[in-house]
């Protein structure tokens, strides 16, 4: 068998017969988050067009993950949206990548926080979700259709919406929004602070996502630290190990260890 035949045999595919012809279905390609440990656990990144929930208490590690996700998109010239109530995490990106980075600030004091610009949308708050949907639709229509598969968005307002609108209304809004984002070619990370909500509220929201990533606090040899784990990722391969996020040196060692794991360290849900 030739090398070309070997390579073709190894390609993951779903085949069916249509008018005597075999069709090959492409698997979901990964979109790198830019956060090395997370990309390693995900075996490359988040599958394109997936919606993933990031549950985390307020911490530097969560902020860094969000920042890397946004920076990676902007630096790669990929359409990148950031929906937030406090824009300091990515203010420089809005200024430096005005053609591909779009900021949506849901804050009544937004105009005092950030100068107006064509790529910055300032809304009164999270109370009127219709206004946010209109702003997202307006910005999406400005994007290059050829970049549909590499678009990314971070929704950093879920906990605010959930506390303001309640589980029923938030779930209804998210069902519509996530469907629209997927059809528009966006890969989504939605940030939720689990400490602010009841288990019932969390379940009502988390069940809408195809994947779930969790950052928790726990003890390390050096004291309290943060740990990252992929809780689920629908029908995708990922490492089930929990990674420690405390200290750059420890992160480097953890990343090296994860990359050296053999196949028993992987989990596939089918």
Identify the meaning behind each predicted range.
Residues 2-26, 236-270:
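C-terminal regions of RecA-like/P-loop NTPase motor modules
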Residues 30-87:
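Glycine-rich P-loop/Walker A and Walker A-like loops and their local beta1-loop-alpha1 context
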Residues 86-89, 185-187, 191-197:
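Short beta-alpha junction loops
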